[in-house]
Amino acid sequence: MEILRIEPTPSPNTMKVVLSYTREDKLSNTYKKVEETQPRFINQLLSIDGITSIFHVMNFLAVDKAPKADWEVILPDIKAAFSDANKVLESVNEPQIDNHFGEIKAELLTFKGIPYQIKLTSADQELREQLPQTYVDHMTQAQTAHDNIVFMRKWLDLGNRYGNIEEVMDGVLEEVLATYPESQLPVLVKHALEENHATNNYHFYRHVSLDEYHATYNWKTRLRMLNHFPKPTFEDIPLLDLALSDEKVPVRRQAIVLLGMIESKEILPYLYKGLRDKSPAVRRTAGDCISDLGYPEALPEMVLLLDDPQKIVRWRAAMFIFDEGNAEQLPALKAHINDNAFEVKLQIEMAISRIENGDEALGSVWKQMANRTI
């Protein structure tokens, strides 16, 4: 059994290892520690420092690494674990992987709906910041003698961000303070004490009209409107289109997120505006939305992103072309084959290989990997 190629996946902590052997049992397994009953090559891989789990299905492995582990160290060890290591993709030894590549997960720690701490997690770093003391004080006021604080704390997913983690923290802090202004804290405390149950998850949705939004001059209020906006419909497009021109990046980003919820090809022109935004975070978010929608009609616009100055945006473009592209995109892919970012270069090589081999897009495989049992 040999390794045919190594491919990146949407997660910076997971690599796909394509094998020359296909499982005949059509089953899948997840391995997390060395055990005698497991295949020898699986145990060899799990013995590599930094590898945390392996998912084996069909003819490939999804290899997960620890967030602080480096692919540039792990990949040669993966090759060496197979008998014919010299046939593995030799180029993986050459480029240097940037540990700061990819997504930064943003989370907000709350107690009974009252926020008091932000956590950011990147591929190799975790950063936390407590909100101003008044938030902690109000959180304390919401406690009762019978509350199990540890059990009742909740991490709210704020979505992914991109860029320098310290700068991202500044931006997320600004967003949180705008979404939960100090003036709202007494209301949250009152609600928490009135409800007084362990599953309290105070959040409300409120639809606003274009006129009301347009008449709002405070950007923090505009952001709050978007954060509390229900799932949008076609009738909300004028409002969201207006928000795309906002001077504040968090507002534009949230407008893109909401537009991406309208699952229709008619929304693509508005997402294209996001691809041209001056903020790389907004451009990447727009690319993520287009990727989630999966409309091949977006290929010409995504091809243009291969020239984006930010590698997080170029990577998303190459990934989309891999998922949806065809022979028409080969010239553009080959023109960018020497991208100086390891992840982008590998993704471009993978897209070229898939298209030239006539293989179908692997969207269903990514879905299977995402839904696998951990």
From Swiss-Prot:
Keywords: Virulence
Nucleotide-binding keyword on record: no
UniProt GO MF annotations: oxidoreductase activity
Pfam families linked: HEAT_2, Nfu_N, Virulence_fact
Keyword Repeat: no
Function: Required for hemolysin production.
PANTHER family listed in its UniProt record: CONSERVED VIRULENCE FACTOR C, PBS LYASE HEAT-LIKE PROTEIN
Family: Belongs to the CvfC family.
Name of the molecule in the record: Conserved virulence factor C
Lineage: Bacteria, Bacillati, Bacillota, Bacilli, Bacillales
